[in-house]
Each structure stands twice: as C-alpha cells, then as structure tokens.
C-alpha cells in the first residue's frame, strides 16, 4: 500500500518535471513490486514454508475458523449425545412410543400437493401453492397434519381487468389431512375439506374467517424451483446447502456438489404476475359497487335472494379496515401512476368507501417493511382459536462479513445466520407482527434500537400461535451441512477430516435415484426429556460413503418451551447401524416387493417410492417408506403399500399397522396392541408365587428406573438406554407372573 502510494506520488512529481525517461523506470519498479509482492513471494512462501509444514502453519487459522463458524451458525450450542443404536425395538418400546407411531408421516409433500390439487381445488380459479406440516391436538391427541390454503389463481382466459381487481379478490378455506392415514382408495384422510369448509367434529376449532386476501400466491411454474430464502434489497440469497464437506480453513470455503440456484432478481415493486395459464393480481379493490365473489355455489345459477351469489357465486363484502382508502380522485390518480394502470381512473365501480389492497404476497409484504431481514420461502398457515387463518413467516439476520466464518457456498457469501424474528401475517387483514425470538443476537439488537416500535417480545405471541411455531427447515439444512465438518473441534482432526460426515441419501420418486434426504418434521418421544414433541430430524453417514452405516442423526426442537434446542445423537464407536441406502438396497433385494413393483409398473401406472423416514424408537431405529401408485394419465397419487424395516427385516403391508404387525409378529394398531388383544388379568396358577408378592422383584424394577433417571440427568444416554431396557424386561416378567396375557 505504502509502495503504491509512494509510486503514485513519484509519478506525479516526474510528470510535472517532464522527465519521461525516469517515469518509465518508476512504472517498471511498480510492476516489479506488484509481481514479486502479489505473485512470486506468496507462491514461494506457500511452496517452501507452508506446504512442508501445512498442518502446523494452518493450525491457528483452523482454530479461528472452527470457533467462529460454529458461533456464526449456532453450532456451538449443539449438544452431543449418544444413541445406543440397538437393531430392533421391543414391543414395550413401541407402547412407550405409541404417539410417535401414530404420527409417522406417510404423505410426502409432492404427492400431497398433487392429491390436494386433484381432489380439493374444486373450481377453475383455485389452487394450492404448497403443503406444510404442522401439529394440532385432535380428539385430545397430538396429531401431525398436512395443511394447505386454497388460494386464487385466475386463468388467463377470464383475467379481465374487472375480474382481476374487483370480482376475484381472494382465496377461500383450508385443506387439512392426517399425515399417517389414508382412505380405502389410498387418498388423503381429510380433517378439513370442501367449500364452505367442512370441519371434522374432533377438530377443536371452526374456521370463521376463511377468506385469504394475503397469501403465498406461488404460480404452478414456480413451485418446483423455489429456493430456501428471499433476500432484501441489500442481501444475497443463500443457495441450497451442499451435502458434502470439503477442506475448510482460513481463506477457503466449503464447496457444493450441486449447481448454484438460479439468481433471484432484486427486490422490486409488486406487479401483476402472468404466465401462459394464470394471472395473480398485484392489487385488488374492495368495497366497490361490483360484487366480490366469495365462493361458487353448487347447483345454483343466477342471482339468488339476499347475497346468495352472482352467476353461481356467493357474494361478500370486505369488512376490515385494512388497505388504502382510494375514494378520492387525487388518490386514484396517484395510484394509477404508481401501478401504471388507467383502470383505477376510469372504472366507475369505485366509491368513496373503496379500499386498495396491495403487497398481497406475504413475502413481498414482509420484505417491504423489513428489507434488512432474510426471509424464509416456506411460510405456513395456522388456524387460530377464534377461527382465523394466520401465516407464520421465519426471517433471519444475516451478514457476509463475519470474520473467519465459512460462507454457505462459494457463490453465496453469507456466513452468519440467525432465526432471530418470526412474523405473523393475518390472511384477511394483512396485519403483520414481528416477534423477536433471539433478542441476544447482536444484529437484531441493532435493528431493535433503530426500529423500537417494530419488534415485540416473543412472550407477547398469542398462545394459539405459539403452539404452532416450527424450526425452519432452511436454517436446519444449513446447520446440518456445516455440522458435517464442524462437529470436529480438534484442529488436527479437522485438518485430516478423520470423522467427516455427509447428509444421508435415499432413493425416492419414480426413477429411484439417490438424493440427499431433506430435513423432515415428525412427532417423536424426545430422548432428552421423554415427552412427545414435534421435531426436525436429519441423518448422517460417513463422508464419501453414502451407502454405508449411519454415524449420527441431528434433531431440532420446535415446541415453544424448547424452541431452537439442537442435538446430535452419535452411535457408539464400532456400532453398525444401517444407513438409508442399505435399507433401500434391502428393499430392492426383496423378491416379493420387487415382484409387486414390476406388476404395478406394467398396468398403465407407475410406482413412486416415498421418502424414507428414520425414526428413533427407544434404543433402536425404525425405517418407514410409503409406496404410491399413480396412473400415467392422471396425476393423482394413491398410497398402495407401506414398507417398514428394523433389524435385518423388511416387510411390506397394506398400511402402517399391517406392516408393523408383520415386523413384530404382534397385532399392533395406532401404536399399541389392537383392542381385541389388550391386556387382561387371569388368576395366577397356584403353587407358583407371583413376583408381586415378592418385594425384591418390585424393588429391582424401581432400581432400574432410578438408574435410568440418574443417567438421563447426567446426560449418559448409553447407560440410560441400558437401564431402560432392563426396566422393560423386568416389567414384562412382572406382567407374566401377575397373570397379564397379551
């Protein structure tokens, strides 16, 4: 720097003197300095100093990189535990995990989206942007569900100006189904369906405000290529995280084995979106003279009595005070210029009471208020206790300038990420509320000082919203990818990659090609506190060996009281636990299953293999994979079979319970024994004293339970699993001796 500055000053001095000969020597000296300082000297240091002693020279930089990267992605708060990895769960463990079994997800998002679109669109103007997973207490039990709002997609052939902005203003209703159940035809088992919404009696809420004026509105062409984040005006968009680690140190980055995502355009003012089939209006006008169509009436045409429809539609009138008043000519002129739309000036249906609703896409809406936040592209709807539909949007604080931290990918330089804020957006009014979920985040602290009235404390979130918060999949995927390398904190081990991991792979879809497993939501009995919880999971295999055994799995808590708690459960050294590819190979090698697949593929239909779910059940793992059948001409997938594996066995049943019954050779339903196989007492045989009469048998059971409790409190999960197994065995002995039959 000083040499360059001196050279510039010397050049200016010689130019003033007119000494061009000496000026040439100055330029040559500057070039030689650049050549030696920027190219030759660093290369020589690398070749003769660093390379022969690379590990020693890199160690201090690796230490900094490990510490700062773990902090930047919150990996320093990940707690390491051990999972026993036993080959086969016992029937007693199945009983203990009955809620988890009753919530095993059989419906994948892609198949559900196709099924919902075929069965529940119900009208030309309606469609589904996405399907999301959530949980509700239904019939007094925790149940995982799939939920999708029915949004408005206006076909181009009827997308006149009046239809776009005055008549068709909103979507209508919610579709919800249980993720574990399906009908006899293999279709989803609906909890909420149809128009007007038909809600099952066991569901605790009724939908009293089904209109959706503010939603995702993702066109069908955009569904398959959505990326995990939306950037603000000055932020970059992280790519889909890589699934394999490479050497990372000071001055190097992790490399992705996937192509970079298509670039996201800079934030723009909202505008009408049009494709070859559909149009989504940039704004709508409410409280006008024109009828606002609410939903189609079946079997009725023409105008009925009162507000019962226009041309077969029920009419409605917007009741909220949201939107911008647009009754005056002056405002109409300004907004006509704003949207470059003369219709706002020329239309005669606008009245002094009329209002304009804009920024109707919730991601654009949130970004317009907080462009400094990175926005997750997977918002999801929640049904509140008063029957409203509210969107939850995850947002992040992010920067590209965190020292020593490794960026997400070479193309995207974001190297600090926090799920600091959650935003709720009312689907009817568009009202937004920003809740600070990580008030200790330094970046969020700065934003809260700059905008003191924008953010609320997380405690202010209503209870019926708190019950449905989720840990974002996009952040968890990034953290899991980083964890593949950064679970190693020893710089020498890190340098050698002695224990590098990668995201496990599965075979899914029609072609069955290996693809990385996506993080998946599920209900499990949490190993760390023994409670049934909604969690996010992902498995790991050794780096470069996706077809080998699993080495660990990672979990994130979603429930409010444990939100953001991260765990990695490693398997004991030398313990061989089947990885997903090994299970897939076992499925492919099963003669009976292969015969069924071949038969179905020859009948004008195609077999689609669902996602392989790996679920911890007690000290073991349970592997579940649904099988769909879809006609070649109709995109309506149906669940045909369910494959379950544990230990070295693979079975295929007509449903989950049939498969579990085959696997464990015990009648099982809903996670417990079938009703006709419930326990019942019988009189013990005389002459053989029952252990119940012997206090030592009961004391032994209590000792095992106490040992398990102490092990859990100390975080010794290997001892916890062993003690719990002994307690189950002793309990089974007591059951048999007491005269309990199954």
Language model features with spans:
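Soluble extracytoplasmic regions of secretory-pathway and membrane proteins
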Residues: 1-714, 718-740
């Amino acid at each position: 720097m000083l040499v360059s500055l001196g050279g510039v000053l010397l050049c200016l001095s010689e130019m003033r003197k007119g000494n061009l000969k000496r000026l040439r020597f100055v330029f040559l000296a500057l070039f030689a300095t650049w050549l030696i300082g920027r190219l030759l000297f660093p290369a020589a240091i690398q070749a003769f100093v660093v390379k022969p002693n690379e590990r020693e020279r890199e160690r201090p930089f690796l230490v900094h990189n490990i510490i700062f990267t773990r902090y930047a992605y919150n990996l320093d708060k990940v707690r390491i535990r051990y999972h026993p990895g036993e080959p086969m769960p016992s029937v007693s463990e199945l009983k203990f995990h009955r809620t988890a079994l009753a919530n095993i997800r059989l419906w994948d998002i892609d198949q559900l989206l196709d099924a919902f679109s075929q069965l529940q669109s119900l009208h030309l103007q309606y469609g589904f942007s996405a399907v999301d997973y959530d949980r509700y207490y239904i019939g007094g039990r925790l149940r995982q569900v799939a939920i999708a709002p029915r949004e408005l997609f206006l076909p181009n052939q009827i997308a006149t100006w009046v239809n776009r902005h005055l008549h068709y203003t909103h979507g209508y209703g919610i579709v919800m189904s249980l993720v574990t159940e399906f009908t006899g035809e293999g279709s989803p088992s609906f909890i909420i369906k149809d128009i007007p919404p038909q809600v099952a009696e066991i569901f605790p809420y009724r939908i009293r405000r089904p209109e959706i004026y503010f939603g995702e509105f993702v066109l069908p062409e955009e569904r398959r290529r959505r990326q995990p984040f939306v950037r603000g005006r000055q932020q970059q968009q992280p790519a889909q995280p890589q699934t394999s680690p490479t050497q990372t140190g000071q001055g190097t980055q992790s490399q992705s084995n996937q192509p970079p995502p298509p670039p996201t355009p800079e934030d723009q003012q909202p505008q009408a979106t049009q494709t070859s089939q559909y149009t989504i209006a940039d704004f709508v006008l409410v409280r006008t003279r024109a009828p606002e169509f609410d939903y189609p009436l079946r079997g009725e045409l023409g105008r009925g009595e009162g507000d019962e429809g226009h041309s077969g539609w029920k009419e409605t009138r917007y009741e909220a005070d949201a939107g911008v008043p647009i009754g005056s000519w002056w405002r109409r002129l300004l907004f006509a210029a704003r949207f470059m739309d003369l219709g706002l000036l020329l239309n005669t249906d606008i009245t002094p009471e009329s209002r304009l609703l804009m920024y109707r896409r919730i991601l654009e809406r949130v970004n317009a208020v907080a462009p400094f936040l990175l926005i997750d592209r997977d918002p999801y709807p929640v049904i509140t206790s008063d029957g409203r539909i509210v969107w939850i949007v995850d947002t992040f604080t992010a920067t590209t300038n965190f020292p020593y931290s490794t960026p997400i990918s070479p193309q995207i330089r974001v190297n600090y990420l926090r799920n600091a804020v959650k935003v709720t957006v009312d689907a009817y009014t568009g009202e937004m509320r920003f809740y600070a979920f990580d008030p200790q985040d330094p970046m969020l602290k700065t934003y809260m000082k700059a905008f003191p009235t924008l953010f609320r404390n997380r405690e202010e979130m209503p209870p019926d919203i708190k019950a449905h918060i989720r840990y974002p999949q996009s952040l968890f995927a990034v953290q899991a990818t980083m964890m593949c390398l950064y679970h190693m904190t020893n710089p020498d081990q890190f340098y050698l990659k002695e224990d590098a991991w990668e995201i496990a792979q599965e075979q899914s879809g029609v072609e069955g090609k290996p693809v990385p497993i996506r993080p998946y939501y599920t209900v499990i009995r949490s190993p760390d506190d023994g409670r049934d919880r909604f969690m996010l999971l992902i498995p790991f295999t050794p780096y470069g060996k996706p077809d080998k055994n699993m080495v660990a799995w990672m979990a994130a808590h979603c429930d409010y009281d444990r939100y953001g708690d991260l765990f990695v459960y490693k398997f004991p050294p030398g313990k061989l636990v089947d990885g997903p590819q090994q299970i897939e190979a076992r499925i492919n090698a099963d003669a009976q299953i292969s015969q069924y697949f071949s038969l179905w593929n020859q009948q004008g239909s195609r077999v689609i293999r669902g996602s392989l779910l790996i679920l911890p059940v007690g000290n073991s793992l349970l592997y579940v994979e649904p099988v769909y059948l879809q006609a070649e001409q109709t995109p309506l997938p149906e669940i045909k079979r369910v494959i379950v594996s544990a230990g070295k066995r693979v079975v295929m049943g007509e449903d989950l319970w049939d498969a579990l019954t085959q696997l464990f050779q015990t009648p099982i339903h809903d996670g417990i024994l079938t009703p006709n196989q419930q326990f019942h007492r019988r009189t013990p045989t005389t002459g053989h004293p029952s252990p119940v009469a012997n206090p030592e048998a009961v004391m032994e059971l209590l000792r095992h339970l106490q040992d398990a409790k102490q092990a859990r409190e100390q975080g010794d999960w290997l001892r916890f699993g062993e003690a719990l197994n002994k307690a189950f065995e002793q309990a089974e002995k007591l059951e048999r001796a007491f005269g309990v039959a199954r």
